[in-house]
Amino acid sequence: KATLLDGSYHPVDSSEQAFKMAAHIAYKQGLAQAQPCLLEPICLVKVILDDASTGDIMTVINKRRGTVLGMNPSEEEQGMTELDAQMPQSEITDLATVVRQITRGLGHFTAQFDHYEQLPQALEADVIANAPKFSEYEG
């Protein structure tokens, strides 16, 4: 959304098309000056798992750009560990299957949106390359 703060009209040089083109150029210049970045959703993940599987699950979380926040004995299930982590939402898609495989069906997890973080630059180019293309000016 943009708000035009000042402008002028001339009966010969002003037309709807001229204003549309001026708005398009101003938008592109403003966007470039704003230095935009891509954000990705980060989720809080809570994994309940058997004690023997904690190392393997921590490896999975780290490989998926996650951060382990802490581990505690589970208050809900005796002999189990509760692992808290933050992970990008895009890395959680098949986590249920992975947790079940590593824990031999004993583990489970929950995920809840927490905040947004800037997408790493290494992944930004891939996202941009795979984004749908729009015409330069759709007037």
Predicted regions and their residues:
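Accessory interaction regions appended to the cores of large information-processing enzymes
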Residues: 1-139
